[in-house]
Amino acid sequence: GKDEWAVFQENFDLIHENFFRKLKERYPSLTPSDLKLCALLRLNYSSKEIAKMLNLSIRGVEAARYRLRKKLALDGKDDLVTFMINFK
């Protein structure tokens, strides 16, 4: 059967107009775990909530967010959550 994440991804794509597809097109280097993080940030989850969902430590989440910013080439003043919410 499909894993929970695959189902989540499909539903999320429907609601958020191909969010994952467009992200992957624009940023081909994003991994499946990057995409998970992107989705949770778009839903405005806190680092604490994300840590729980992804089974990471808070520091692990902070590190993942940092790597994600690098991949998206965001500079210091760009907010990751705002970027995800506004991404089309």
What are these regions (language model features)?
Residues 1-88:
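Cytosolic nucleotide-binding catalytic cores of signal-transduction proteins
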